[in-house]
Amino acid sequence: MANAPCSYGAFEITVGVLPDVPEAESVLSAISGAGYEGTELGPPGYLGDRLTLRKSLANHGLALVGGYIPIRFSEPEHWTEDLAAMDATLDLFAAADGTQAKPVLADGGSAERIRFPGRAAVDRSIGLDEAGWARFAEGVAQACDLARTRGFEPTFHHHTATFVEAPWEIERVLELTDVGLLLDTGHLRLGGGDPTTALREWGSRINHIHIKDVHDEVLAGVIADAADMPEAWHRGVFCELGTGDVDLDSFFAELSRSDYSGWLVVEQDMVPRSPRDAADAAASQVRNRAWLAEHAGL
């Protein structure tokens, strides 16, 4: 079982932007103290650089299990820049002895998709056309080649407010590429899919799992207000396990019947608004770990 800095308020839209993001050392201490055995990287450099990351993780008995790598796959003019950034992230993996870490490839999205979270399941017009999918697949192939050349097996993270959000978009990625799939229970729910069905149907491709719960009504409010994905984060669309609308009991029952043997990463993205929020987030992750022990036997 692993956790991630985003559960404590440290991710791409907060680090270096908001004043109440907790220090990395306190996050690592909280992850270890809650009973998790690994962590994802968070924004590159947040947990440490190539000289310090391995020691920081070892001091808390944590393995590096993955790191989020956004790439603008639909925009080839940005591939050189984004793949160079990916290569630098893989340098961190190597420096941390992250031999089991998954490069978590994700679509860098577009301004349009960021404005319309949770809509692609019912409105395919905001998705890619056939030429766009061909470009997208070529970009994914290049990223996979880079990861494998560096000795890491990648995974692809479907994500709300990107070009791979809805089940039909995930299926296109699986059809057009050979990349493994990161199944995220929360983002799939927000994208109009069912995590249990996905685990059953896509199980042979799944090589990494994020465990999330979500409040459906928060996303519904965001859509009703014509708000964007950052606003969904600010409104707290992700919640503690067992308190939202994802049928996690069904998901874990299906998981127990599957052959999956990779990491499970608990994520509860939150945006810190005061110094107190870091302590509240740490308490939430303790409760999430206890929920998993009680309900999933993990």
PLM feature segments, named:
Residues 59, 78-181:
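Active-site acidic/histidine proton-transfer and metal-coordination neighborhood
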Residues 1-32, 58, 91, 97, ...:
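Histidine-acidic metal/acid-base catalytic patches
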Residues 5-7, 63, 68-70, 107-111, ...:
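Short, flexible active-site-adjacent loop segments at beta-strand->alpha-helix junctions, enriched
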Residues 48-68:
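Aromatic-lined substrate-binding rim segments of carbohydrate-active enzymes
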Residues 7-23, 42, 74-81, 125-133, ...:
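Active-site mouth loops of central-metabolism enzymes
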Residues 38-52, 72-82, 160-165, 187-193, ...:
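Acidic-and-aromatic substrate-binding clefts and catalytic sites of carbohydrate-active enzymes
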Residues 40, 66, 102-104, 155, ...:
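Conserved beta-strand positions in the central sheet of alpha/beta enzyme cores
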